[in-house]
Structures are given as structure tokens and as C-alpha cells.
Regions:
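Bacterial signal peptide processing site
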Residues: 21-23
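C-terminal motif of bacterial Sec signal peptides marking the signal peptidase cleavage site
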Residues: 16-19
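A residue-level marker of the well-folded mature domains of exported/periplasmic proteins
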Residues: 26, 30-37, 41-398
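Positively charged n-region of N-terminal signal peptides that target proteins for export
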Residues: 1-11
């Protein structure tokens, strides 16, 4: 666990930003999509480096696409980067659609093992039941489970199998920082667009509400927020129409939290001169590229609420390959500001698109969260809404 506690935000950002570089292609079948990214050069490197503990890496996604420019891709770039650097063969496996079942996810694990993977990165909370099966079926395979906790795997007592390491994040802290910064920067009509109402998305959203409320109280103003889960991790005409309605009704900035669902918010924002907050990785480059290509009139991204996906995946792989699995076996690393700089907003000048909110103000509130002066509610139950003051009105829409 010490390896994780030693991470810095620089490492997190470097790996997260790697997601900007490319999107992998895939071949589809009726049940899954898989791609092998190994090359002859990688094989030669493997002989030189002697990768004895990991013989093959797989990333299995619970839902969505690989090139979502967010969660799935942030993890994949870490897997790909690790394989390229170490010379270890790596693959990815995708379910065939948004309605994939636990059995479909079990099939992906089975296929990954058949293809030679002995270390599998399972990405997404929905992988819990399939992991319970896979850990028993393949006791010699190491599973790194991102956004999965013990109760997702074992709903009776939360026990994590010895060949599984769970990685979760305190998304509520990143969401808080985004909401706080937005209101301090002058936005008073906010929106939260979630994908599916899964725990990580809920924590991001509820943190966003709490941060916006705190800033409104400090400023002595009233703010309004629209709040909605789109029940999917991709953008489409339905979600775009919903966002058109928000922006047309006065919403100034939307925190789009849910894989590729951001595309609908960005499309609507461009039509209405609105703004956007990205998620999981620094998504500012998407706005920059959109302007350069003529897709957007202006960069809609104000900031992004990030978590160290790439760093967590890389260090998990390092631990396996170093033969140190016993240090994390059967545990859940839950990472936030107390543990290190695992969550936050991008502070690089190119991505700092606030008008009045300063880096000093950001660092002040960040340290208050880190030292416990500010406590952010980490509720991940959609039925339990965060407690707020009269300074914020939240319209929870269905």
C-alpha cells in the first residue's frame, strides 16, 4: 500500500493526460470486442526486461466504449503505456452494448484468460458479481478492480478475494472542488449531468452540490442547480435535447459526469454559449481540439474533476510485476486528498480556464479538505440526497 501513498498528483496528471493521445481501434463480435496491442518490438523488450510475474495484461470494461475520452480510456492508456514500456502483451475486452449482463462480463474474463492474461484490470462498479466468479474460477490470476469495492463483489460481508485488489476514489472531493470553484468563479446557474447512477457518479455529483453550496454561503448568494442521470454512458439526441433545454433555460455550466455522455453537453453548450466541466481526466484538450477542427466556436471546458486512474492502475501493475502482490491482496485502496493528491482539478495554465477564481483560492480549499477542516459527505446512495443550506436550490430531475 505504501507505493500508492507515495503517489503525487504529477504522476496522476501525467497518466491521465496520456488519455489525450489516441483511441484504440477494436474488432467487434456478438459478445465482446478485443484488441491485441502487442508488437514484435514489445516481445523483444520482454526478453530483455524479464517480465516474470505478469505474462499478459487485459483490461475488461463493464460498459461503454474504450475511446470515451474519460474513465475507460484513462485506465486503458495506463495499461497500454505499461505494456509498451515493459514489453508485456496487452489486450482490451468490451461488452457488446450498454445492456451487458454479469454473464457477458464473465465471458470477457474467460476470454482474457484464454488469450494468456494473468493480470486483469476490471474497470467499473458493475464488474462486482463477475469478479466474485472470476476470482474463484481463476485463483492464479491477479485482478485489479477499479471503482469496485468489497460489497460490490460480496454483498453479504464485503470480503475481497485474495487475488483481487480494489481501487476506489473519493470522487466527492473532486466534485466538491469543481462545484466550489464554479460558484466562486461567478456561475450561479449550474447543472449536473450524470451517466448511470452508479456510486462513483453519485459521489461526484453530491460533492459538486456540496461544493457549490459552500461557495454560495461564503459569497452570501443563491445558486440554482439542475441535476439529472441520463442512465447511459454515451451522448445521443435525447441527452442533447435535455441539455439544450437546460442551457436555453439559463444554465451556465454543466458538470458532465459519465463516460462519453459529455459529448451531448458539449454540443448543447456550443449552441448556447454555455460552459462545461469535464470528469475523470483533464478534458480541456477536447475543447481545444474542437475549436481547431471547427467543431466548437469556443472551448467549453472551464475545468475537470479528476481522479488518478492511470496512476492507480500503473502502480497496481508494478506491484504484481515486482512480486509484491501480498502487500495489497484482498484489500481496498480508497484514495483521496488525505492519502495524497489523488483527486483534484487541473492546475496547468493551459487548463485553468477560470475568470476570477485563483490558484491560491483553490489550494486553500483543497488543503482544508485534506486536513479535515472541510468534511465532504461521501454518500453514494441515490435515494439519500446531501444536506444543503438555503443558498442552493437543487432540482433533482427524473
Amino acid at each position: 500500500m505504501k507505493k500508492y501513498l507515495a503517489l503525487t498528483m504529477a504522476a496522476c496528471m501525467a497518466l491521465s493526460l496520456a488519455a489525450c493521445g489516441s483511441s484504440a481501434s477494436s474488432t467487434t463480435s456478438s459478445s465482446a470486442a478485443a484488441s491485441t496491442e502487442a508488437t514484435s518490438d514489445s516481445a523483444a523488450t520482454a526478453e530483455a526486461t524479464g517480465s516474470d510475474n505478469i505474462t499478459g495484461i487485459a483490461q475488461c470494461c463493464d460498459v461503454g466504449t474504450l475511446d470515451d475520452e474519460s474513465f475507460n480510456q484513462g485506465c486503458w492508456e495506463a495499461v497500454k503505456g505499461y505494456g509498451d514500456e515493459s514489453g508485456i502483451e496487452y489486450n482490451y475486452y468490451l461488452p457488446s452494448g450498454e445492456d451487458a449482463s454479469d454473464e457477458d462480463r464473465e465471458t470477457l474474463i474467460r476470454q482474457a484468460v484464454a488469450d494468456g492474461a494473468n493480470t486483469i484490470v476490471c474497470v467499473g462498479y458493475l464488474y462486482g458479481p463477475a469478479l466474485a466468479w472470476g476470482a474463484t474460477e481463476y485463483p492464479d490470476v491477479h485482478f485489479i478492480a477499479v471503482d469496485v469495492n468489497g460489497f460490490d463483489i460480496n454483498r453479504e460481508n464485503g470480503t475481497i478475494p485474495e487475488n483481487v485488489f480494489c481501487v476506489t476514489f473519493k470522487e466527492e472531493e473532486a466534485g466538491y472542488l469543481a462545484g466550489y470553484a464554479a460558484v466562486k468563479d461567478g456561475f450561479t446557474k449550474l447543472g449536473f449531468l450524470g451517466g448511470q447512477a452508479v456510486p462513483a457518479v453519485i459521489r461526484y455529483g453530491y460533492g459538486y452540490v456540496q461544493g457549490a453550496d459552500a461557495a454560495a454561503q461564503e459569497l452570501g448568494i443563491n445558486v440554482q442547480m439542475n441535476y439529472y442521470y441520463g442512465a447511459q454512458f454515451y451522448g445521443d439526441e435525447k441527452i442533447t435535447a435535455k441539455m439544450d433545454g437546460w442551457y436555453d433555460g439559463g444554465t451556465e455550466v454543466v458538470f458532465a459526469c459519465g463516460g462519453g455522455i459529455w459529448t451531448s453537453a458539449a454540443e448543447a453548450a456550443d449552441k448556447h454559449d454555455g460552459k462545461l466541466i469535464g470528469v475523470d481526466v483533464d478534458q480541456n484538450y477536447l475543447g481545444v481540439e474542437g475549436v481547431e477542427s471547427g467543431k466548437y466556436k469556443a472551448n467549453p471546458f472551464v475545468t475537470s474533476a479528476m481522479k488518478g486512474l492511470g496512476a492507480a492502475v500503473k502502480n497496481g501493475l508494478d506491484t504484481v510485476n515486482a512480486g509484491d502482490w501480498s502487500t495489497i491482496a484482498g484489500t481496498n485502496g480508497n484514495f483521496g486528498l488525505e492519502e495524497g493528491d489523488y483527486v483534484g482539478l487541473p492546475t496547468d495554465e493551459a487548463s485553468w480556464n477560470f475568470s476570477t477564481f485563483t490558484l491560491d483560492e483553490y489550494n486553500t480549499v483543497l488543503e482544508k479538505i485534506r486536513n479535515g477542516e472541510i468534511k465532504v459527505d461521501n454518500t453514494s446512495d441515490d435515494a439519500t440526497k446531501p444536506t444543503t443550506s438555503s443558498n442552493i436550490t437543487v432540482d433533482y430531475q427524473v
